[in-house]
Amino acid sequence: MERKRNRGRIGHPMKIVALCTGDPERLPGKSYKTGIFKHAVNGAVMIDAEGLVGDAICNRKHHGGVDQAVYVEGSLTLDWWSRELGRPYEPGTFGENMVISDLDNRDVAVGDRFLTGDLVLEVTSCRMPCATFAARMADPKFVKRYTAAARPGIYCRVIRGGVVEPGMPMEYTSFSGDKITMPELMETFGRRLQGADRARYLAAPIHYKLRALLESQADEAH
């Protein structure tokens, strides 16, 4: 199926603004370590099927894995958050691995792809906020705030790995099937879907955990 090739929203080619990795760190008042504290890195980074080489993933039950290997944020979305938070946004604050210029998270759908050099990423799911995220932001209400904003971050699988660095141009291609955007996926996350809606989700290259949930719901319906 043919994919639509996109350029940046303002007519300029997209590019990698930042690549971010982190080490295991303890949250204040918590006994466990987290990899959410990420910082922009200089120079080239290898991205393989598990994500950015050298990046810490502490809670493997909910983070990381082949269908959640790279967490992407769009610069237009982060500009919005900067205004919302009333302070400059530092890359890595939300725990993202990659920031892409001229990209609004709300426009991205499951199955869309990001391509640069040898690297090919495919969108699988949206970021769902958790208590660790709220603690990172030092705001106990941040889960509700992030959900209400309806601009969730973007999880990707690695179709083909490669070495990348900040400043590299990024090509963006749209999934040719029915769109399941990040805001829609966030709104329906974990819900029981019926009929055409379930079929539409299963027709997209969605995160394997969501696929398993939807397939189990279909089995229960029979």
Can you name each region flagged by the protein language model?
Residues 111, 161, 166-167:
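Loop/turn positions that initiate beta-strands
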Residues 152-155, 167, 182:
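Hydrophobic, well-ordered secondary-structure segments
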Residues 137-144, 149-158:
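Active-site glycine-rich loop that binds ribose-phosphate moieties when present
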Residues 2-134, 141, 177-222:
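Electropositive, beta-rich accessory/interaction domains or terminal extensions
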Residues 118, 167-168:
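Residue-level signal for inorganic ion chemistry
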Residues 100, 107, 153-160:
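Short alpha-helix capping/helix-loop boundary micro-motifs
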